[in-house]
Amino acid sequence: SCMKAAPMKEISIRGQGSLAYPGLQTQGNLDTLSGPNDATRGLTSLADTFEHVIEELLDEQQVIQPSKENKDADLYSSRVMLSSQVPLEPPLLFLLEEYKNYLDAANMSMRVRRHSDPARRGELSVCDSTSEWVTAAEKKTAVDMSGATVTVLEKVPVPKGQLKQYFYETKCSTKGYAKEGCRGIDKRYWNSQCRTTQSYVRALTMDNKKRVGWRFIRIDTSC
């Protein structure tokens, strides 16, 4: 089978401030560019600026992580969100984690990648995947670290009411290339298959004895 992505790591920052976007200044816009060459330079400039912002966020993340003494810190995950409505975008910490994992796998620093061959930006994944927010109402049950099936609670009590639990899940795409095996594998000599893999995240759940608590459960996180 194809190489599987590394499990997502829990990110602990609750109660220690939040990440904020550094000042973002683009170098002109596409409407003011005069020709094809200028357009190419403009797009490259915007891409470099975006990567520079991510680099600063990752550097800041290492500074604001709490100490191990904060018992509530591990309740936060890059793939779990408590919200009154469906999140409109992927979680920022998830995007940072994905980008960092890519750089680690490619053995490159961000500064090196910004100045590398632009053609590398068009690389394709071995397996196609889809990601979306899933509610506890849709998920209903999950498997915890002990192998027991637990009920995922839809709402979490907070001082001013209740918030819903949302999980950002990634799984193999059911369309296109996934049915034919892994991309880049010579089908004449090798059999391959794209498979959805899971990782543990922290969620509010209830076991079969009606005991409610925060437990690590498995969700789909990669293909």
Swiss-Prot record:
Residues 6-114 form a propeptide. Disulfide bonds join C127-C194, C172-C223. This is Neurotrophic factor BDNF precursor form. It is found in: Secreted. The gene is BDNF. It comes from Acrochordus javanicus (Javan wart snake). It holds the Pfam family NGF. The lineage of its organism: Eukaryota, Metazoa, Chordata, Craniata, Vertebrata. Glycans are attached at N107. InterPro entries: Brain-der_neurotrophic_factor, Cystine-knot_cytokine, Nerve_growth_factor-like, Nerve_growth_factor-rel, Nerve_growth_factor_CS.
